[in-house]
Amino acid sequence: MKIGQFVETTRSFSAQDLAEFTALAAAQTPGNTVPEPLIGALFSYLLGVHLPGFGTNYLKQEMRFLSQAPLDQPLTARVEITRLRPEKHLVDLATTCRLADGTLICEGRALVLARDVGA
C-alpha cells in the first residue's frame, strides 16, 4: 500500500434495489433517490474487498452528503489512501462518490485497521 493508491467501483441502483433495501431496513425512503446507507455500502465493499482488502477492520467512517443520487444513474465510489501509520496498522482514506457527469454526491474519510500496512 502507498499514499495516493486508490480503487473505484461503478454501479447504479434500481427501483428493485430500493424496494429490497426498504423491506430489509424497514426504512422510509424517497422513491426516486438512492438511500445514503447504500452509498456508504459501496465504500465498505471497496475497503473490504479491494483496498486494503480481506482482513480489513473498519474503525471509522465519516460521510458528508452534498446531493441526492437518482435511481438508475451510474455512481462511482472511490477510496484513496491519504495516510499510512504502519506502527499502528492504520490506514486513512478519502472517500468520494460521483455521478457520471462528475457531480459530487458524497465525500468523506475512513479509518481502517490493516495488518499488512507496512508490506
Where are these regions (language model features)?
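Mid-chain, well-packed structural core segment of small domains
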Residues: 52-84
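Hot-dog-fold acyl-thioester-processing enzymes
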Residues: 1-56, 60, 118-119
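HotDog/MaoC-like acyl-thioester-processing domains
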Residues: 2-5, 71-119
